[in-house]
Amino acid sequence: KKYDTSTPKYEKLLEANYKPAEVNFYLAQNWYMRKKYDVAISHYKKSAILNDKAAYMPTLLLHSAISFEKIKDKDNAKSFYSTLIDLYPSSNEAKVAKQNLTKL
């Protein structure tokens, strides 16, 4: 339930333009955990645009793919799973992506 209380804090940080790539990622994670996948996708996208080399990119790609899957957008889900596998083949996230991709 920390997600409910931390979201406004992250939104204030965004307003102050404080580390916008990271803050968008953490906001996306909050919305993802609350099953608000459309909002999560929006924040993941902003984060990736601002810093596509961040250490959290494998998680961002995996959670984006799962979010697309949850909102029944299989094409984008497949695309994100494939990108994750291509860019981070030895990551734990890529292992999950491979499993999830076979189910689509």
Predicted features and spans:
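Canonical tetratricopeptide repeat
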Residues: Y26, H63, A97-N100
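Short solvent-exposed coil/turn linkers within tandem alpha-helical repeat scaffolds
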Residues: L14-A21, L50-Y56, I85-K95
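Terminal, low-structured helical/coil segments at or just beyond the last alpha-helical repeat
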Residues: A77-L104
